[in-house]
Amino acid sequence: MATPTDERRDLLTVIAYLRAAPGKEDDLRAALESLVEPTRREAGYVNYDLHEDVEHPGTFFFYENWESAAHLDAHLTAPHLTRFAGVMGDLLDENGLTITRLRRIA
């Protein structure tokens, strides 16, 4: 029996991990929250969900799905993302950004 999401196996899934520099947790949270609404209006967006680690406040994850790599690439050059890139160095700790691209296999 097929699952309801089988037709979506071609999506590009991204998990972005971001950890705030000490004392910058609230600033990073606000900056990340400001990315959600404009991203959800982008072409190729499927979902763009921001989470915070309940055991490690100030550690955030975006769980994203995109129609294609081209849509993700366009997202990464969108004005709201380039503005964030300009300030993220002040908000993240030294190991504070990891982006993982995934493809669904089952």
Predicted regions and their residues:
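Residues at secondary-structure transition points
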Residues: 3, 7, 19, 23, ...
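Glycine-rich beta-strand-turn "strand-cap" elements at beta-sheet edges
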Residues: 1-12, 50-56, 86-106
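Generic hydrophobic alpha-helical membrane-segment signal
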Residues: 5, 32-37, 52, 68
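Intrinsically disordered, low-complexity sequence elements enriched in Ser/Thr/Gly/Pro
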Residues: 6, 17, 27, 73, ...
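An amphipathic, aromatic/His-enriched active-site/gating alpha helix that lines ligand/cofactor pockets
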Residues: 37-46, 65-98
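Short, well-ordered beta-strand segments in beta-rich or mixed alpha/beta enzyme
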Residues: 12-19, 49-76
